[in-house]
């Protein structure tokens, strides 16, 4: 197994893991300072910073985006299904604006008593 204790080139930091230590701009600066070359920011952190400002800070720090967290929750009840789909479309657009390699998805659990092949399972 590779020892990453002193070589951070292969690391990507999921920014939710350090959200209590600082805002997204602080996290970006700390990653650059410590040689971590990629991050995986969360949508709420980007929204709090502003997408244009976050994208510029990431670029200016020389960081890559290994992903963007998160889309998903496709199995919302019927009343929220359209809202969930619209939110996922926005997440895809945001990921593209940031230049993220991927959008991390959490598909969501199936509603109680649903069966394989039901509408919620097909949404996944």
Regions found by a protein language model. Give the residues of each.
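Hydrophobic faces of well-ordered beta-strands that scaffold small-molecule active sites
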Residues: 7-15, 39-41, 63-70, 103-105
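Active-site acidic/histidine proton-transfer and metal-coordination neighborhood
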Residues: 2-5, 29, 74-124
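Acidic (Asp/Glu)-rich catalytic clusters
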Residues: 1-8, 26-33, 47-68, 90-100
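Conserved acetyl-CoA-binding loop of GNAT-fold acetyltransferases
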Residues: 36
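Acidic-and-aromatic substrate-binding clefts and catalytic sites of carbohydrate-active enzymes
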Residues: 18-23, 41-53, 73-82, 111-115
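Short, Lys/Arg-rich amphipathic segments at extreme N-termini
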Residues: 9-19, 23-27
């Amino acid at each position: 197994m590779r020892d990453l204790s002193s070589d951070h080139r292969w690391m990507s930091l999921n920014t939710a893991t350090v959200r209590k230590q600082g805002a997204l701009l602080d996290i970006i600066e700390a990653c650059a300072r410590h040689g971590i070359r990629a991050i995986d920011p969360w949508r709420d952190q980007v929204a709090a910073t502003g997408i244009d400002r976050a994208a510029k800070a990431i670029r200016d720090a020389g960081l890559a985006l290994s992903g963007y967290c998160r889309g998903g929750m496709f199995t919302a009840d019927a009343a929220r299904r359209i809202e969930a789909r619209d939110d996922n479309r926005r997440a895809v657009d945001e990921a593209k604006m940031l230049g993220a390699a991927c959008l991390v998805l959490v598909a969501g659990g199936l509603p109680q008593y649903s069966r394989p092949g039901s509408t919620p399972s097909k949404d996944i």
